[in-house]
Structures are given as structure tokens and as C-alpha cells.
């Protein structure tokens, strides 16, 4: 059973992450062409990098409390990244007959987020062992 402090940490992190996602998504989407959902891709790549970085810190240090870990990972980064939006945007591209763009979106999100999580993890591992 989670403590009320952990639940509050997740909720407050989620609030900040959701607002940050909306802001960054709008900022990225405004600056780039609208043929591909770059805003969603951007927040997913960014969030995956920081999740990897945090996982390394969580594994190799004891600096973070359970509430801090929950705030940052499940709350903030969980709300910043968005699998459901990625899925619906890919579906809409397919329904619109944009098979190449849908395939590109799916590939960039799937491969890109794993790459960014791995990159973040190795940066975090390097930083904790320096």
C-alpha cells in the first residue's frame, strides 16, 4: 500500500508533467511542419532520456527518497511522455492514408525512445561513477 505522501508526490509530479507536456508540445508543434506529430515525438524522446538518466541515479545512488522517485518518474515523466497520444496520432495518420508518415512516426517513437532511454541511462551511470 502506498503512503499518502507517495500518492501526493505522484499527483503533484503528474500535474507538472502534464502542464509541461502541453506547453512543450505546443512549442514544438508551432515551430515545425505539421506533417508529423513532432510535439508528441519531442516530449517522448525528452522524457525517455530523463527517465533513463533517473533510473541510473536510482540504481547507483541512494540520494532519492521513495517520494522523490515517485514524483520524478511516475508523476512528472509519466505525465510528460504520452503513449496514448502517440498511438492515436499514428492511427489518424493511417486513416488519412499517410502510411509512410504513420510508419515513420511509429518507428521514430519506438526506436527513438529506447535509444534516448539508453543514452540517458549511460549518461547517468557515467555521472554517478565519476
Regions found by a protein language model. Give the residues of each.
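Membrane-interface helix-loop junctions in multi-pass transporters/channels
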Residues: 1-130
